[in-house]
Amino acid sequence: MKKIFLVCNAHLDPVWLWQRAEGMAEAMATFRIATDFCEKYNGFVFNHNESVLYEWVMENEPELFERIKCLVKQGKWRIMSGWYLQPDVVMPSGESIIRQIRVGNEFFREHFGEIPKTAIGFDAFGHSRGLVQILKKCGYDNYAYLRPRDKVCGPFIWEGFDGSKINTLKLYEWYNTPKGEAVKRIESYVKDFPDREVNCVTWGIGNHGGGPSEKDFLDITEFADNCKDFEFIHADLIHILMNLIKLN
């Protein structure tokens, strides 16, 4: 049966057009919502990156941080990318990008005992070919991105200037969904790609925090129950990319 992997996330620019305190408050609110959701619904998986947001939670709500650590151990909360922030990857120097990776990786190694192997550039407006070499030498096997925003999506092998290669996934349409429109995203994807064996659809309220909504989750569950052509799996990007690699 054809598979659609559903990646719930909540993109959040912590200091874009607002003060640090506001970004911090939104990050903690988003993490509270996601934590409650993971604990309530079996089979649901939440994904988030950016170690600075986890640091804020650890410093201000240690009990919430411990709950997240438990969810990570259970596989219900997945750490994406593992960077300090989700930065632009065209204008900054290679050294800057490496430091983003190193600082984030050290935090997740210390507090969660893991380092992700899939990097993301959901909101970066461009992706330098030189990034491939940096990712590979920093230990990443995979990369997922969105922009430029168009109907072209799917997996490919990206080769860097030095011959380094990385499994890469171009996402469909957008990384988040407005409240109540997750099923609309899935329907659009199925219409555009009815014959693909392995598929990825991202959802969750975001662009400035939010996370999963109960309406969307229940709508997705109902849609999945009535859709006989696809198996729907709440997952993270590494599971999707591994399935795509096996397929190709």
Question: Where do the model's predicted regions map?
Answer:
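Catalytic-domain carbohydrate-binding cleft regions of carbohydrate-active enzymes
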Residues: 1-248
